[in-house]
Design a protein with these regions (language model features):
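Beta-strand-connecting loop/turn residues
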Residues: 164-166, 236, 243
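Ferredoxin-type iron-sulfur electron-transfer modules and their immediate structural context
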Residues: 2-226, 231-232, 261, 265-268, ...
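Strongly charged, low-complexity linkers/loops
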Residues: 228, 238-240, 244-246
């Protein structure tokens, strides 16, 4: 009995040692050499693994940066921003051009007041599920479905649902422009746009492509595709296609002429300073009557 146990232990020990040697030889022969700079780049990244860079995660993005070096034009981490990319460039010993910061914008103004409900949805609270089942619980089949898929997708707590309007609201201070909410929205009402000068932006807060009368019936704030905004824009920043106006933020100079011209209020201007009306000048005091000459007594 004792001899059997000893032989069993010896055989297993030898077998384990042989297999370990074989595994070591195979690992050394087929190992893939990895650039040590990948680890260095990964250390300076935020570590959010949000996928906003277009890669699977921060590790994959670090590898992509190393492989793309010295040209980092296609590499950008929205969470780290320009400051983070400067750190990446410093590790790789290259230069990188600064990019315009962006923010998520909700292009729908179909509030509970503007877009009345025509039916009530009682299924699973998910925008994707709701969109797959039917066109929504209002007359507009293009607008926000209100289930908060974008809120759930945001890792930074930058989006919340407004209980009064029923629409998502973006916190610009927290938004990193990772694009997770854009991918999560089945109606494509969320868009990444340049923050603009002093965070001021002008955009069409509507995605309805129905004809004007149909769109207006479904929502009081819908774009009706009249084209008035495009006609008054001096910079050719506005186009109208499929009954819907769109403002190219790379051409827009923030003159706001389109905002004043829009008959439905579908164009929004945000973060502009409030211009206080000039106080009216006080009416001038009436002129004093001219003095009468004094007659001398004779």
């Amino acid at each position: 009995m004792t001899t059997t146990i000893i032989w069993t232990i010896a055989i297993l020990t030898v077998l384990g040692a042989v297999l370990a040697v074989v595994l070591y030889i195979v690992a050394e022969k087929f190992k893939v050499e990895e650039d040590p700079r990948i680890d260095e780049v990964e250390k300076v990244l935020p570590g959010a693994n949000c996928g906003g860079c277009g890669q699977a995660g921060c590790r994959a993005f670090a590898q992509f940066c190393v492989e793309s070096s010295p040209n980092l034009d296609k590499c950008f981490c929205p969470v780290g921003g320009n400051e983070g990319m400067q750190k990446v460039a410093a590790v790789l010993g290259v230069e990188v051009a600064a990019k315009e910061p962006q923010v998520a914008v909700v292009r729908c103004n179909g509030t509970c007041e503007n877009r009345p409900r025509t039916n009530e949805y009682g299924g699973y609270q998910s925008c994707r599920v709701k969109a797959a089942l039917y066109s929504g619980d209002t007359g507009c089949s293009f607008g926000c479905l209100g289930c908060g898929d974008g809120v759930a997708a945001c890792q930074f707590g930058a989006i919340s649902m407004d209980p009064v309007t029923g629409l998502p609201v973006v916190d610009e201070e927290k938004c990193t422009a990772c694009g997770a909410c854009v991918k999560a929205c089945p109606k494509a009402i969320i868009e990444l746009r340049n923050k603009g000068r002093r965070n001021m932006r002008v955009f069409v807060s509507c995605v309805n492509k129905d004809k004007g009368a149909v769109a207006r019936k479904a929502c009081k704030a819908a774009c009706i595709g009249c084209g008035k905004c495009a006609k008054v824009c001096p910079f050719e920043a506005i186009t109208v296609e499929n009954n819907l106006a769109y403002i190219d933020f790379t051409k827009c100079k923030l003159c706001k002429k389109c905002v004043a011209e829009c008959p439905t209020g579908a164009i929004h201007a945000v973060n502009f300073p409030v211009i206080k009306p000039k106080p009216e000048a006080a009416p001038a005091a009436p002129a004093a009557p001219a003095a009468q000459p004094v007659k001398k007594e004779e």
